[in-house]
Amino acid sequence: SKGNINLNHQGKNLIQFVNSRLNQQPLGYIETYVDFSKPVKTVNAYLQPDCQHCLATFKFSHKEQQSAVNFSGKNFPMTQITALLNVPNTLTGNADFNIQLALTNSGLTKGEFSFDAQNGELLGLNLLDMAAQYLPINYNSDLTASRNMNTPYERLESHLLFENHLLTVDKIRLKTTALLGEGSGAIDLDNVQCDVNLTLRSTNEKYKKLVLPIRFFDSCYSPQYKVNIDQNFRHQLKELIKEKLK
């Protein structure tokens, strides 16, 4: 990457990078304004990767031992977001996002994360293959043409909260060609353990009442799962069969 630094004797500086990279991911053009002339030190950065209509802003402020970060963007590649956050890449696609962090002595104390991602894949998890064993979904050749361990999705919304080393998954909403999903849970960041409950249903209106509950647990890199075939699911299935036999 190439850079340009414009220093100001009053403590206000401009730093520019072209073709920048972080954690092996291209970040494109970055323009950063640094102001250390006041009691509250600030850094404002604008990121523009080599993609259409995508932009992100990074705002950092620091006073004494307290710091605050706001990182937000529109239509930003998820692979670049995970690279910037230095977290495992489990998702592709582009997202509108907003991240707010509070730090004390450079240690993260609280955080809030909102993502609205579109047209990507959940990596390492094939929900379609899993749900097709229990739900009457449109499991045709188009959907299974590239049978692998990923889940293509049309839209994925999530809202997460961080406090005391625990990341609470407040909301997950998922839409794929054949499935709708909703869920919540928690992630222990110390040992990267996940515990998430997700309900799946078919996008077909005929079967929307049939809801499949699944619990994902253990390592976030390769989660185990348990399908909860409870009395409620069996009752829904019986009612569906009765309707089909009429």
Residues covered by each model-derived region:
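Gram-negative outer-membrane assembly/targeting C-terminal domains
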Residues: 229-246
